[in-house]
């Protein structure tokens, strides 16, 4: 489950005054949740037995298979991640020294639905695997990109100088630039930009471009999953479809139940369907580049 969670992008989650970056993955019989406010990191991985006991404790008037509870829970969590509303009326959180308690309150078939994520402080290895190592790789990649851009700018300056030596004249003065000085640029950037970024108080999380970079550095390192054995339990470990149907039954006193009051089974979920709750829609097609116009004559 942790390997599957590692490959998911980080998304932002705002609950009252608390701002987190998080990722979550559901299967038909378990889930894994990871949250961080960049001061601490918390996680919970729950199996079927824990989920069943917690569902009975929190929702005494609802009866359903574990897969149905997880399906409905996923449909609550998914729209909240990275949304503008960010679940102000759905989620609440309480911190203690031992855990971060993330509580969910919703409605299902006219009845209240409750859930609690009991997140423990993540281990150092988890923090390193999901944040420290990827961030180090991202930093190295950005440094390499910066060096390539500096080389490109120097080549452009040399190209412009050659045009000027040939007698070319710039027709638009507003496009005139100074010769690129890498050392001067770095000093200016550190003095003017970096301090402003550190003091901006921006919510934790990655921009779209940084998230793509995170995905790129994670992809080659994420372990591949061994082929699942053909057993009766293999289906319960497959990622759950976001649109899985939900089958719940309201509990009634025993003397009022009839022999035909059995709980209907949830519909089967295709093996190819995936419930990555931090799924990002595919990027749109890039616009065609404009034809370059000459600046010298």
From Swiss-Prot:
The record marks 111 as: Leu-lock. InterPro entries: NHEJ_factor (IPR052287), XLF-like_CC (IPR053829), XLF-like_N (IPR015381), XRCC4-like_N_sf (IPR038051). It is found in: Nucleus. Residues 263-286 have a biased composition (Low complexity). Gene3D superfamilies: DNA double-strand break repair and VJ recombination XRCC4, N-terminal (2.170.210.10), Helix hairpin bin (1.10.287.450). One of its GO terms (molecular function) is DNA end binding. Residues 1-131 are annotated as: Globular head. One of its GO terms (biological process) is telomere maintenance. One of its GO terms (cellular component) is DNA ligase IV complex. Keywords: DNA damage, DNA repair, DNA-binding, Nucleus. Residues 232-255 have a biased composition (Polar residues). Pfam families: XLF, XLF_CC. The coiled-coil region mediates homodimerization. The Leu-lock (Leu-111) site inserts into a hydrophobic pocket in xrcc4. DNA repair protein involved in DNA non-homologous end joining (NHEJ); required for double-strand break (DSB) repair and V(D)J recombination. It is also involved in telomere maintenance. Plays a key role in NHEJ by promoting the ligation of various mismatched and non-cohesive ends. In some studies, has been shown to associate with xrcc4 to form alternating helical filaments that bridge DNA and act like a bandage, holding together the broken DNA until it is repaired. Homodimer. Interacts with xrcc4; the interaction is direct and is mediated via a head-to-head interaction between N-terminal head regions. Component of the core long-range non-homologous end joining (NHEJ) complex (also named DNA-PK complex) composed of prkdc/DNA-PKcs, lig4, xrcc4, xrcc6/Ku70, xrcc5/Ku80 and nhej1/xlf. Belongs to the XRCC4-XLF family. XLF subfamily. This is Non-homologous end-joining factor 1.
């Amino acid at each position: 489950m942790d390997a599957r969670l590692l490959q998911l992008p980080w998304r932002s989650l705002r609950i009252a005054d608390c701002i987190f970056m998080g990722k979550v993955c559901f299967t038909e019989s378990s889930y894994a949740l990871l949250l961080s406010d960049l001061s601490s990191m918390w996680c919970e991985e729950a199996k079927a037995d824990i989920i069943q006991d917690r569902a009975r404790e929190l929702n005494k008037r609802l009866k359903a298979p574990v897969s149905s509870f997880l399906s409905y829970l996923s449909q609550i969590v998914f729209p909240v991640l990275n949304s503008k509303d960010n679940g102000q009326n759905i989620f609440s959180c309480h911190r203690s020294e031992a855990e971060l308690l993330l509580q969910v309150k919703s409605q299902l078939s006219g009845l209240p639905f409750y859930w609690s994520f009991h997140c423990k402080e993540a281990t150092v290895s988890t923090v390193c695997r999901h944040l420290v190592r990827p961030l180090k790789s991202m930093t190295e990649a950005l440094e390499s990109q910066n060096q390539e851009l500096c080389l490109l700018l120097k080549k452009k300056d040399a190209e412009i100088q050659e045009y000027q030596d040939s007698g070319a004249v710039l027709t638009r003065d507003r496009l005139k630039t100074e010769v690129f000085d890498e050392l001067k640029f770095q000093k200016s950037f550190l003095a003017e930009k970096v301090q402003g970024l550190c003091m901006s108080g921006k919510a934790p999380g990655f921009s779209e471009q940084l998230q793509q970079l995170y995905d790129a550095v994670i992809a080659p390192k994420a372990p591949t999953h061994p082929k699942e054995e053909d057993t009766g339990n293999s289906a319960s470990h497959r990622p759950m479809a976001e649109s899985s149907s939900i089958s719940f039954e309201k509990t009634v006193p025993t003397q009022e139940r009839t022999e035909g009051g059995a709980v209907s089974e949830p519909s089967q979920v295709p093996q190819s369907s995936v419930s990555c709750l931090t799924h990002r829609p595919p990027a749109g097609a890039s616009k065609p580049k404009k034809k370059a116009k000459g600046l010298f004559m």
